[in-house]
Amino acid sequence: MAFKLWLLDEETIYEHVFERYTQLEGQSGKLAQDLGIQDRRGGVLEITFEPSGLEGGRKKKRVRRRNKASSVEEDQNVAVDSYHVSVGQSISSLRSSRDNGNSTTGYVLWSTTPFFINWLLYSTSAAPFRLGSQVEVTCGSSCEGHKLELPRLVDLTGADRGKRGILELGAGISGILPVILGNFVDTYVSTDQKGILNKLKDNIMENLSQLTRKRCISRSLRLELPTVEPVGDADITAASLPSKSTLHLEVAALDWEKINLQDKKTHSLHPELSLIGETCSSVYVIAMDVIYNEYLIDPFLKTLKQLKHWLQTTYNLQFHVLVGIHLRSQEVTTLFLEKAIIEYDFTVYDIVDQVIQESRFNFYLIT
């Protein structure tokens, strides 16, 4: 059964948050009681994603399989490819008071992201994001809702003629979202603060072999399509890639406190954002575990507001946002929803799904 959407408003925010944290408390014996770092013991993590389900995202110890993205018979409803990524992280930078202006959470991989990838690609309930379809909406406590038409977030078949893009905010260093979800979109722009970008680029390049369905071009990563067949290396020749479409993949600095898309001069500083508008008909903004203290909420929501206005008015894009939150502070979650709905006038839906409700995470769709 597909997930449902609960339309939140200024009255139902509190009912939703109370119910979700009550669920969380009832599962305290089953769920890890930690801050959510994927693995704080190692500098390099080996992670496998596979169709066997949400357990596929567990870290694999002492395994170094390279370029092992495999596929079986295609299925429109659930992804069939497997992926293995190697993620270099920096525990020392996480603990540093000097690195990246003391904003250091992005130096490690947080567990919200692997969970989201597994759910999006392999959970049957996430099918609307893979197929593009109408989703049932419940308004408050009433069972009489309506349907919301969702464009595809990812196209598993490659047959959809629509051009789709992903803009990732607060990407951190891992780079696993672009190298996996990049297989199913046309343009992917991964952003974070400037101090994070070198390690983010390193991890993307380390795992570029997982982009098995696309030919990748990138100005920021200095990747171009091959034009001449290299002797003795048939695996990467242009002739060997005739059936693959092209992914535009870029990595860019985006400071939520400084962005000003109303200033025309700013546009020239963010050509990657213009790339999404120029190449896509729909865009999903993805932000995983970026709301963990109250100080980030206003800059984040102001950035979303600017992006929505600019991409819709300038390029007429379909615009949706997916925010993943690791449920830590009930007060921070409540404040985020209050500000998003009441102060910034966003339409916010809780994604209601059993798999999510049995985890420490929650996902919100914002339009």
From Swiss-Prot:
S-adenosyl-L-methionine binds at residues 110, 170-172, 192, 256, 288. One of its GO terms (biological process) is methylation. Its EC number is 2.1.1.-. InterPro entries: Methyltransf_16, SAM-dependent_MTases_sf. It comes from the Eukaryota. The keyword Nucleotide-binding does not apply. GO terms for cellular component: cytosol; protein-containing complex. Keywords: Methyltransferase, S-adenosyl-L-methionine, Transferase. One of its GO terms (molecular function) is S-adenosylmethionine-dependent methyltransferase activity. S-adenosyl-L-methionine-dependent protein-lysine N-methyltransferase that monomethylates 60S ribosomal protein L1 (RPL1A and RPL1B) at 'Lys-46'. Present with 468 molecules/cell in log phase SD medium. Belongs to the class I-like SAM-binding methyltransferase superfamily. RKM5 family. PANTHER family: HEPATOCELLULAR CARCINOMA-ASSOCIATED ANTIGEN, RIBOSOMAL LYSINE N-METHYLTRANSFERASE 5. This is Ribosomal lysine N-methyltransferase 5. It comes from Saccharomyces cerevisiae (strain ATCC 204508 / S288c).
